[in-house]
Amino acid sequence: MIKVINILSDTNIGGAGRLLVNYLRNFDRSKIEGKVILPKDSQLKPYIEAEGYEVIETEHGRDKSFDMKAMREIQAILKREKPDIVHTHSAFSGKLAAFLCGVPVRFYTRHSAFPQPKKLTTFPGKQLNGLINSTLATDIVAVAEAAKDNLTETGVPEKKITVIINGSEEVRRTTPDEQKALRSSLGIAEGDFVCGISARLEDYKGHSYLLESASEVLRTHPDTVFLIVGGGSQEEALKRQACELGIEKKVIFTGFVHDVAPYYNIIDLNLNCSWGTETSCLALSEGMSIGLPAIATTYGGNPYMITEGVNGYLVPEKDAHAMAEAILKVMDDREDFEKLKIGARKMYEEKFTAAVMTRQLEKLYEEAVNRRKKK
């Protein structure tokens, strides 16, 4: 039995947290046992506990990658728990604590991809960053080739990195009556075509460009609704933008929702407008699980997930006109739309299930532990 402690510093539910819950749900409990360290009052806690895992809370380090007090708390926990593996997710405090405690196997997952500052891609910053990461982590997981590229360009040795593409659980299907009721409650007419996006409302997710695209689409296709699922710091600004564009009656903001499944079930076309931090997008794979084709930007790991004309289309990032044209192309060619739906489901089954992802990580865990035992 391998004892694993996962560490996150997030208090909200982002991609890293959702990914961890998928791992926990799919681990082979005859091989893997573990606990999760979170900052106090994290929204992730009930979801992790629902999977049967204990959550250990720290008083410090809320939404901070590094916090000295949090690091000391984590050190005390690790000394008590004595795990075989510590696996950190955007939590430098945990990474450093695991090293200082002498935990034999220290995993770190890179969940994002974004332009790196010059000081980290040139001498001496590149060499120093590579040395720090190689010392603190024995094994590194990148959730997309784009994330791996981010790491190698900042000095992290390629041999340390394994790419495991994000997988997701199959979205729960709702009944036609449930779908009709939700559409009605949101004011969506029976014949409306629903374009949807599920993402935190942050600048780098590209919602402002989506609203510009929506304005263009609605000029010729007024029976279209844009469903924006999620909450975030840009919510009020985006609502103002929708009003300024005169499309507020055709744009629905749900705010943060605990269960996105009912919303996926009323979406016709899945959208991803990211221009920063995107790797392998869970919202895309979740949508594919119920046959939702997608229009996505070419940023980060999106090109690995979307194959042109098979399960969707790709457009340049920050290009509202290109996004609008792609949406219209799908809406106006229903035969192609039906083919894309079939392609989306097929691709999910072949590449993007949570079970496939988890088996890959379990194998890495076993190999890392066995490697350490031989030393």
Positions of PLM-derived features:
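Membrane-interface segments of envelope glycosyltransferases acting on lipid-linked substrates or membrane lipids
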Residues: 1-375
